[in-house]
Amino acid sequence: MAFWRNRHESPAISQERSPSPDRFQNSEDIREDNNNYNEDEKLGWFASFMGMFSLPYDWYLSINEDIAVIDWDSKSNSVAWPLGNVLTFLFFSVRLLQDNVIAPNINKLTHSDDAFDFSKSKNLQKYDYFQQYGGSASSSENLYYKMLRQLHRLFYLLTVLLLITNISVTYRYLFAHFQTYSIFYWKTVPKSKNVTKKSLHDLNHTYVEDAKRDSLWGMIKYLLFNGSHDDETNRAHYYELRKWTPSRFLTSFFVSFSPIAFCFLWMTDVTFKTLIPIIIHQYVLWFIVIDRYEQKLKDEQILSMSSVAELNSKVIQPKMNVLKQDAMVDATPYNDGIVYFYPAYTTTRSHVFATHTLSGKLSKEKYNPRTDSFEDANSQRTENYVRFSYHHPKSINGAYVRESYPSRQHSPRLSPSRYSHLQSGNTPSAPSTPLLIPSQQPHFDHSMLANASRNHNISERRNSHSPIKQHFANRLLNYPDETNDSIPDVSDDRFRMDDRFRRGRQGYFNRSPDINSGTLHYDDGDDDDNRISKSPFRNSSSSPFR
C-alpha cells in the first residue's frame, strides 16, 4: 500500500515579468494594454451564482439533489399520513358536492336551453309586444348557475388529478420497489414465488435486460447465439430472490390514500352517512398495516439482531479475540535462562507494505513516522541472538525481559526430572516454559489473588512448594566441570537494570553467589529490612499476601 501526496508548486516568476512600481503605475493601464482582457470578469458573485441556473436542466438537477437528500422514512408519520388523509377527505368533499349540488342541475349546466329563445328572432323583435319580454330570458341565467358551472369544471379537474395521484401511488407501492438477492449456498429449492432458478453460466454472458438496451443487431445476436444453453452448463445454478421492499413513507401514504376508499367514493352516491364507513376504513387499515404488521417486522428485526449479537459475543469474539502473549525462550544447549515476554502479536505485526508497480514489479515500502512518508524498505540481514541476549534489552520493540533467577534456573549440567511437571498445570492467561511454570492455584482464576504470582508490584513469590524448585535448589553453587565442556556463569553486572526500573519491575545490581556459603551478597546496605525488601527471591519476600 502506498500513499501519494499531491504537491502544488506554483511556477517561478521571472524578474522580467514580475510586477514592480516602475513598470506599472496604474491597474487601468494594465487592462487597457491587455488585448485578452474579458469584460465578463467584471461580474460579481451574483452573476456567477445566477450562471449556475441559466439552463432548465440545472434547475432539474438542483431540485433532484434537494429531494434525494431528504430522509423520507423519518417523515412518514408527520407528512405522509396526514397528506393521505387530506387527499381522501378532499375527494369525499368533491363527491359530496357533485352528488348533492351539481347532479340535480346537470341539465341546466351542460345543455343549452336557448332552442326556443324568441329574443334572438329578428322578425319578432319588430313587435313591441315581444320586446317587453326580451330581457326575461337572459335574466334567467343568473349568477348561481354560473358559479355551479365553474364548480363543475373545477370538481372534474380535481377528480382527474386525484385519480392520477392514486394510481401512481398504488403502482409505485405495489410494483416499483424491489431488491434482488443472489443465493449461492442454498441446497434445496426455496418455497417462495419470488425465487427464480438461474444458471451460473449466465453470469458470464449478457443478461436479457442488458440485451434490451442494446441495438437491434445486438438483440438479434443475443437471441441467436445466447438463447439456448447446454444441459451441462445448466447443472450449476443459483437462486435469485426478488424481495418487495416499499419504503415507510410510501406505505403510510398508500394506507391513508387507499385505492379502495377512492373506488368506493367514486362508484357510490355520497352522503354524509358515507363518512362513517370511510373513517372506519381508514382506522382499520392503519391498525392492520402500520400498527400491527410494521411492528411485527420491527420485532423480528430485533430478534434477529439479538441472535447475531449473541453469536458474536459467544462464538465470534472468543474465536477472534483470544487472549495471547508472545514469548521467546532460550532453546540453545547453553541454557542461559533468557525469557522475553511481549504483548500479543508484537513480533508478528509488520510495518512493511508490499505493493506492485505499474510494470508488475514487487515493491516493499515502510512507513517512516519521522518524515511522515513511505520509504523503500531495504532487505536486511536477519540476526539470531543465540546467547547473551540480555546485551540487547531493546532489540525487539523494548519488550519486557525476565532475567534469569539463579534460584529458579538449573545448572547447565543438570536436567530436570521427568516427574517435575506432573503436578503443575498450564496457566490460562500467559505462556510459560517448563522451567518457568509459576505456582498454581487449586483452580484457575483470573482474579488478583490468583494472578499475584505474575505481578511483582503486589506480591512476589514466597515459599513455593513447586516440584521444579527442589530439583534446582543447587543452582547457586558452581560445581566443578568434569567434562571440560561447561560454560562459566556470566557475571550479573553485565545486566542493564535501568530499563527494568523504568518498566516497573524490581531489580537488583549484585546477585553473584558465594561459592563457599551458597548465599547471595548485596551491595545495597547492611540493613536486614532493606535487604529483605529488595530481594527478588521467593524465600525472602515481604509480600502482604504472605
From Swiss-Prot:
Protein name (database record):
Nuclear rim protein 1
- The principal localisation class reads nucleus
Compositional bias (Basic and acidic residues)? 1-10, 25-35
Q: Which domain of life is it from?
A: Eukaryota
Print the keywords alphabetically: Membrane, Nucleus, Transmembrane, Transmembrane helix
The subcellular localization recorded is: Nucleus membrane
Tell me the membrane topology, using the record's own terms: Multi-pass membrane protein
**Composition skew (Polar residues), residue ranges:** 406-441
Q: Which organism is it from?
A: Kluyveromyces lactis (strain ATCC 8585 / CBS 2359 / DSM 70799 / NBRC 1267 / NRRL Y-1140 / WM37)
